[in-house]
Amino acid sequence: FVLSEIQEFYEVNGLPYTREQLFTDYLKYGGLPMRLVLPDEHSVRTYLEDVYDSVVMKDILSRYAIRNESLLRKLLEFLLDNIGNPFSARSISRSLLSAGQSTTVDTVLNYIDKLQAGMILSKAERYDIKGKNILASTEKYYAGDIGLRNVSKTSEQIDTSKLLENVVYLEMLNRGYEVKVGKLDTQEIDFVCYKGQKKLYIQVAYVLSEDCIDREFGNLEKIDDNYPKYVISSDIVDLSRKGIVHYNIIDFLLDGKDI
């Protein structure tokens, strides 16, 4: 489920809720439908751990006859710890090697393919906005479900901005868009989204401080075309400027903002 579907579940079943609480729970527990009927936080976490360990990991291990369970777990933990960060297969294999896990680039690529097929991981290719071509050297990876990411026994530190980025990524996929990561010279554009003839750009931030406003809006202002451009953050005040539309993330997710 995405957040609007969770809201619909609450409404259909006559359950009390606030939009803010739905969003907070979604950032913590993700969108697996079964967690909505569990009685308490402990039950939800136990359920998510069971899904991660029993269903996802064991299913992938057995379906693809993967023999190195330790490597698969370390690879997934590394990528879920670093959602939204650009990596190449070579840099991932080097990071695993420095952590004491020997592997090869080909094995990393093979295991990533299997994790994507298991829908616990999703890859966003990098797109050169000026050159209009895919950059094969690095990609970004996102969790297929935020809740599974949070119980994956990775770092206790949570980068809220990256979680919001992951949420927007999943939302745009759910809305039927093809989602890529944009590169404009030395600048990053969080998402370039396509659906049929439609194209748009999105920047995601947790809170838009003065410096952050200039960076997030400024990067979009440098794109020399007339496709729609958006900044999404947790800020309540509308900070739209120069034709670039700002949305509060809860409004974006729950009010059917058509972008």
Each model region followed by its residue ranges:
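Alpha-helical sensor/transducer elements of the RecA-like P-loop NTPase core
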Residues: 1-7
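Amphipathic alpha-helical "lid/sensor" segments that cap RecA-like P-loop NTPase cores
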Residues: 8-53
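Short amphipathic alpha-helical segments and helix-helix/interface helices
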Residues: 23, 169, 217-221
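Accessory nucleic acid-recognition modules appended to NTPase machines
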Residues: 36-198
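Catalytic cores of nucleic-acid endonucleases
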Residues: 182-183, 206-250
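Structural motif
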Residues: 198-200, 228
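Non-catalytic C-terminal interaction segments of nucleic acid-processing enzymes
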Residues: 252-259
